[in-house]
Amino acid sequence: MKKNRLCELLGIEYPVIQAPMNWITWAELAAAVSNAGGLGVIGPNAGERTETKDVVETGERLRRQIKKAKSLTKKPFGANLMTSFLDHPGGGEAFSRRCFEVILEEGIPVVVIAGSGPEKYVKQLKDAGIKVLHRGMPVNVAAAKEAEQAGIDAFVAVGFDGGGHTGHDRIPTFVLIPQIVDAVRIPVVAGGGIVDGRGMAAVMALGAEGVYMGTRFIATTECPAHQAVKQAILEATDTSTVTVTGPNGVLGALKTPLMLRCVQMEGSGSTSQEISNFYRPRYMKGMLEGNIAEGTFVCGACAGLIKKVKSAAEVVRDVVKEAEQILTRL
């Protein structure tokens, strides 16, 4: 696959980005993706099994993972910077600010800013030589234009098909991507429902210059998600996922008893914060402990397309190879 603007920008071989996911995208996974030629990204609470309300400890947790990634790869990798912790138990700007400071101190190659208001961090990050991607929330044309004006290097557009929080607008990937591509000059990275080369070829035909995959990387050997989560993804069908509304947007997840209860809550008029208060404390119980009855199993609608646990390197290689074959054939 020929290198494009995104590859040149990030210094990577293939335009494949592993999406940062809460608790389960630690240094080992990020480094494996980067070593395979993509871009691995450390997520919030990476490598941890307990939550903290301490601002300083939050920063040090991130620092430990960055140092670990540096020991595992010499290739570019990234870290996630949340601009808002709307449902964080400690709340507030202080957590974002401390993670931002640690990122500057450690001098990593790439940052993926998630949330609204990225402009407050962009200049200092870029002045430090860090490439800045924005995973918009909200994710729409207006947000992409604002990100471009703020100096963001590339915009990550995740459609409603994705897992985790995808904003409130509920725009499907194949409607979202071409509209954003038409609206901005910076590279657009597509996410939401992409697990293989077919999806990669499709969004690149729509004008995207890279893919942003989360759910596919859950079902990898390097991901610390519980085996029950990976097995549930392998057994998923086209009707195995569900969405509910939280304060950070729509959440995509497997249709577990807990998530069905959230659907009932939403239908009966519960607020997004009340729903979040119900599912959020159960992330670890689901993703790390594998408790199907009581846990939250976050993933995208694409889960039904995944049939095998692979290494991160296999995922990168197979996605790129299949996309190349399809694009050559068209």
Language-model regions, residue ranges each:
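Conserved active-site-proximal phosphate/metal-binding subdomains
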Residues: G167-V189, V195-L330
